[in-house]
Amino acid sequence: MDVKERALQAHEKWGGKIEVVARCEVNSKDDLSITYTPGVAEPCLKIKDDPSLSYTYTRRHNLVAVITDGTAVLGLGDIGPIAGMPVMEGKCALFKAFADVDAFPLCVASKDVDEIVRTIQLISGSFGGINLEDIAAPRCFEIERRLKEVCDIPVFHDDQHGTAVCCGAALLNACRLTGRKVDEIKMVVNGCGAAAIAVTKFLMFLGVKHITMVERFGIVCEGDDRLNPAQEEMAKVTNREHMTGTLADAVKGADVFFGMSAPQVLTAEMVSTMAKDPMVFAMANPVPEIWPEDAKKGGAAVVGTGRSDYPNQINNVLAFPGIFRGALDVRASDINEEMKLAAAKAIAACVSDEELNAEYIMPMAFDKKVIRSVADAVAQAARDSGVARI
């Protein structure tokens, strides 16, 4: 039986991957009077006088909403909000399993930015954080930006920023292994969608100075009328040499390739034209931009993918549970760049100098020290950057 059939049978058996479990006992009239009426009125009045006490008297301090509009679900595309529910439930299960964060799935039946923003804003007071999931670009950029402006809790689009943090960790360790400095490398990012743009911005914040982005139609250049507004913004801050041409042209002499695009677009021959001992991160799923075996044939010193059946899996589960755990622990009002940078460095540091090798630059997803290390680093960065409230 293949994994698809096994998953279908498991989901039918489970009848959902999450449930609500009471933290209080309701076994007597006294329990009832404390848990509900009349006793519940007292914390209500306290919160009325001081809304911040909602973090003390309710589960808000540990509760995250996982929200989608169903327009970019995994590799399935626009399948609608209800069809995206199994993914949202799965994400909630990962939050609980890895970081003891209580998460709740919400599937919003709208593609209107104003409606989505208003809906999330209105319910945000029930949660300690918002995790946006599987929302198509470029709409996802505006939704996140506007929510950050109107909500006083962290809003985090994991498809963008969780990916970016993990890519940052992979780059730090690949550079550590190959003896390169982040600010001296030449990088190519293939793709210019939500994840690719977020990764590029974050790696620039990390210190990378020389990045060229490539889309289906070729190298991303300022002034190209085929670019959407988000891509135009990236064209202004990348491609310092104002190159034109194809992916094959872009990778010549490059130290690093990051792919968030399409299957089998990079060849071993292209890799052979890159700088000595190049680093190749082919993250398209399930079929990467180049298979690791072919990348190594082309001379790649380090290869990473999004797949669990190859070494160096770049998996968001290394990032988002710990990031939210750290943010919730200090009641952060935002998840900012400093916190994401701290997360990337913490993930990278979970691989010691003794452990680091070409087949092991990323810690394993089930390494228990990862989530705690990330959470502690994120919490400290929140304090240092002024967004922590406790």
Regions inferred by a protein language model and the residue ranges of each:
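Adenosine-phosphate binding glycine-rich loop
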Residues: D158-D159, T178-R180, A282-I390
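Rossmann-like adenosine-cofactor binding region
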Residues: E232-A301, R307-D309
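N-terminal ligand-binding/catalytic initiation module
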Residues: M1-V155, A375, Q380-A381, S385-R389
